[in-house]
Amino acid sequence: MVILFDQFNLPEDIYKVIFATEQQEIVGKMLIKYMQDNGSEIGKTEMSVFATRLHDGEAIIKEKGKSPFDKEVKMSYNKRQFYDRILTPMRGMGLIDYDLYKKTYKISDKFNKLMVKVGLMWIREIEKNKKEGAMKQF
């Protein structure tokens, strides 16, 4: 997945940086919240149940409040698109880790480590170009 952002208009919400659409942001937040509610680790079956509930429109975004005007808001998201556009990119970026032996998904801090690594790669590139002299004209 490619993340493009503007340093001067960087959103406060990480999900706005990572995902292209508002619906993807909501589903990504729902997934992380679901995982955190279950000890930051869920099994393959639990992930499938989560995706199926989304697909069937049974996932609740906003629970019904005490006010008569508060409505329970349910959301629907295609199961295949959930795996293609939410889970697979989150695994690829290191936000979620999959343990092949335990067959569990776990919230990971690899994303942070990768962003630090990308920053260090950029600094090395700048230093390399300084040593070689000014960048050659094309």
Tell me what each language-model feature is.
Residues 102-109:
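Minor-groove-contacting beta-hairpin "wing" of winged helix-turn-helix DNA-binding domains
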